[in-house]
Amino acid sequence: MIQTLPATIPASLFEQRADAIVEAARELSDLGWTPATSSNFSMRVDDAHAAITVSGKHKGRLGRDDIMLIDLAGNAVGTDARPSAETALHTQIYRRWPAMQAVLHTHSRTQSVASRLYAGGGVIRLQGWELQKAISGYHSHDSVLEIPVFPNTQHMPELVARVDAWLEAGKPLHAYLIDGHGIYTWGRDM
């Protein structure tokens, strides 16, 4: 794949992001969380761009050339490569939370089964887990952490709107599941 970068983005910065994505994708593939060409990963490059996995590539076999640049509207920048159909879910996070630097979407068996089991209620509620305190905004294992389970759709604007509605209702969001699909989560680094 040929990737031409805007003059404002140093090649070394893009390469660092691409290498971090490749490394994370391989580790998650080794765990069995990214079967074949499923899943997608991205990292913020600057205020207007992100590096993201190209569509249709086996995540355990990625190389630097399998990472492309997009703008935060989800458009390819400087390449004819095609990003994931779910790119809008990544860019939504970067636009909403400028401090977020990475988005991970995986398809582990556990996530997929949990999404099916809890889809009817629309949410998984976690309480009593000591590790909850490691999540921003949660100071006690007695707090209730909700992870929404959104209905699956191939119409990304609909899914983006569901995520927005959750947030506009004032609910905290650190991850979400898509029914029968997988999880999206994000953070300040890969």
Where are these regions (language model features)?
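Glycine-rich flexible loops
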Residues: 1-190
